[in-house]
From Swiss-Prot:
It comes from the Bacteria. Belongs to the SfsA family. InterPro entries: SfsA (IPR005224), SfsA_C (IPR040452), SfsA_N (IPR041465). This is Sugar fermentation stimulation protein homolog. HAMAP family: SfsA. The gene is sfsA. Disulfide bonds: none annotated. One of its GO terms (molecular function) is DNA binding. It comes from Rhodospirillum centenum (strain ATCC 51521 / SW). Coiled coil: none annotated. Pfam families: SfsA (PF03749), SfsA_N (PF17746).
């Protein structure tokens, strides 16, 4: 995924009310940016962190800047949760994810389950359907270990139940965890943060849902999938 325009470097002053961040632009001007992330952003919201912003071309937009990347522990981290679906969809379309290759069509945001939308629906007259849910991962608390979630996510647990229901109905279902940082090579569920989600994933896996963990290379020019991470128990 390429950013449509060059990102703007800035310095994070504070993140607050979940969807807002005060930043300092290169010329010292203060601005407020939109934060497209409903989680806590644990470990990547420290005041003084270098950040990168996109700027909307829409002059009517109240907040023209959006927080895209944060530098944490010496590495770039993608914090915009609107991007993972597109990143994975582009990689699938390009045949860059062997585990999700071989389907004739790809559709995004298709209604299914209990008033939900599946992130990606892959369909093929021979292979059948694959329901693919994508989660953004940015949490790292120790070593080269990425974790999800960074806060309790009842919505995420609901998605696991719906994926298991798709398997029961005869379809394939895949939970993709997209690690938007380059300093991790292993992944696990943060059971201490959300034990219910951890239990839900175990049940989903037992019922045939697949888990796929993909890592990204990030630059201010774009974000692309470059590796598969090991899922740790």
């Amino acid at each position: 995924m390429r950013f449509p325009t060059p990102l703007i470097p800035a310095t994070l002053v504070r993140r607050y009310k979940r969807f807002l961040a005060d930043v300092l632009l290169p010329d010292g001007t203060a601005a407020t940016a939109h934060v497209a992330n409903s989680g806590t952003m644990l470990g990547i919201d420290a005041p003084g962190s270098p950040v990168w912003l996109s700027r909307s071309p829409n002059p009517a937009r109240k907040l023209p800047y959006t927080l895209e990347l944060v530098e944490a522990d010496g590495t770039l981290v993608g914090c915009n949760t609107a991007h993972p679906n597109r990143i994975v969809a582009e990689a699938v379309a390009a045949g860059e994810i062997p585990a999700l290759a071989g389907y004739a069509t790809l559709r995004r945001e298709v209604k299914y389950g209990r008033n939900s939308r599946i992130d990606l629906l892959l369909e093929d007259p021979v292979r059948g359907s694959a329901y693919v849910e994508v989660k953004n991962v940015h949490l790292r608390r120790q070593g080269r270990l990425a974790e999800f979630p960074d806060c309790v996510t009842s919505r995420g647990a609901k998605h696991l139940e719906e994926l298991a229901a798709m398997v029961a109905a005869g379809h394939r279902a895949v939970m993709v965890y997209l690690v938007q940082r380059a300093d991790c090579d292993t992944f696990r569920i943060a059971a201490d943060i959300d034990p219910a989600y951890a239990a839900g994933l175990r049940v989903a896996l037992d019922h045939g849902v697949e888990a796929l963990v993909l890592g990204c290379a990030l630059t201010p020019d774009g974000i692309g999938i470059d590796r598969t991470l090991r899922l740790s128990a």
